[in-house]
Amino acid sequence: MKLTCVMIVTVLFLTAWTFVTADDSTYGLKNLLPNGRHEMMNPEAPKLNKKDECSAPGAFCLIRPGLCCSEFCFFACF
């Protein structure tokens, strides 16, 4: 019984976390396929887009650590 409750709470937490961290929580999961198709057509697209969207050193990065220009995050970009 306890394990079932823990599993239900965990699934609810992870579902909420997915929508909280999405760029646009109302359509966060809807826009995944068009981006994937664009990246399949041009494999270099994610690398090119990352340069424009990366955070400067000192910016807060705990929620989305992949956006640091230096790719090193410990509460802030280094």
From Swiss-Prot:
Annotated PROSITE patterns: DELTA_CONOTOXIN
Entry keyword Disulfide bond: yes
GO cellular component, one term: host cell presynaptic membrane
Primary localisation category: secreted
Free-text tissue specificity from the UniProt record: Expressed by the venom duct.
Coiled coil: none
Domain of life of the source: Eukaryota
Localization, UniProt: Secreted
Domain statement: The presence of a 'disulfide through disulfide knot' structurally defines this protein as a knottin.
Function: Delta-conotoxins bind to site 6 of voltage-gated sodium channels (Nav) and inhibit the inactivation process.
Family, similarity comment: Belongs to the conotoxin O1 superfamily.
Protein name: Delta-conotoxin BuVIA
Organism: Conus bullatus (Bubble cone)
